[in-house]
């Protein structure tokens, strides 16, 4: 299900066996965002991630929305991805960072690998 929020809002995705099964939208932050950047409520996100962990759900990454037609990552997006991956335990080998692009709610899936910090564009399919 694609978010219907304004550009530069976001949240987190969780799942099992590499499949996304749940998500959380950062409701508090959407009222505080500029139209050019997304700043997540990390305290709330971390509490959701901890809750998911206790339920057997893995943290798989963070999504956010972009302005009309912008499918590429900004330098700030890439820096944020690297900082998040650097804070993960070594058991986390990859994190996903979907970007939902308005106006067609197109999803562009990016990921980052732990060992190399390589950011890549990924193929995906919806079940």
Where are these regions (language model features)?
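Conserved beta-strand-loop surface patch within small alpha/beta domains used
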Residues: 1-60, 67-127
